Amino acid sequence: MSCQGTVSPKGARKLHDADVVYLYDGSFEGFLCCVYESFAQHELPFAVWTPQRETATLYPVKDIATDPAVARRVFASFGKKLGAETEYLVSRDFLSGQEDKELLLLRFLHLAFALGPGTVKREGHPVVAPLYAMKKSLDWEVDKFQGFVRFEEHDGMLGAVIHPKNYILPLLRPHFCGRFPEEDFMIYDAVHQAVLLHEGHKTQLLELAAPLELPPPSAREQQFQALWTQFYKTLEIKARHNEKGRMTPVSYTHLRAHETSL
């Protein structure tokens, strides 16, 4: 493993590649404790795993305990020493679904603390560029799901299942809570086994221990699906028929606005 682009301030111990694997609980606080350990030991681990990604290895595994007090100090140092832009980018990129995101973030943080707050603007640097690639993937997916989430009705609650590459529920929360403040709804992320639940004007992000199965659609949803079929056939222009385009998810939130006029 290479620490390409990582430098140490004058007089500081040089960062070295360590034949060790960090194992943490997968939380952002846990990752911040990994950052603390990496800086304390002046080492870049071979890998950073969560229990879900743990596998057989010949390298020693170092369990990194989650300490909220340590996590708060580390996070505070981002804004204080590196600036709000770096704090935002690191926090957002942690939601990425990229498997080696922790190592990419660690490399960047070592570089940023060595060079200062302007590091985040060096988008072409080989250590910085991967963070913008992760952000681009997140931004694209958030924009996609804000416009195309397929809701179905289940006993008075709107339900939707999504399969995003990245963990975007926290980023979707402001959009859907603002769009449907009076509705009870649930968005289930089947990839990350998490739920965004908005019920009784209260919103929660829940992590599930087991996969969730939604019940069959209600009669109203079946009627709504039939209404969409009629809507599609009415607007379809045969000369421009595109079967692949038909397979694209339909924005049910947009269609609901037209339900009474069809």
Question: Can you annotate each of these PLM segments?
Answer:
Residues C3, V7-P68:
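N-terminal ordered "arm"
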Residues D17-V21, L158, E213:
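Glycine- and acidic
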Residues G118-L208:
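Internal, well-folded beta-alpha domain core
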Residues T253-T260:
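Conserved small/polar residues in nucleotide/adenosyl-binding loops
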Residues P181-E183, I187-V250:
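A recognition module on extended beta-rich or small alphabeta surfaces enriched in W/G with H and D/E
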Residues Y59-V142:
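Charged, alpha-helical interface segments at or near domain boundaries
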Residues G30-Q41, L106-A114, P174-G178, A226-K233:
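Short, hydrophobic/amphipathic alpha-helical patches that form generic packing surfaces
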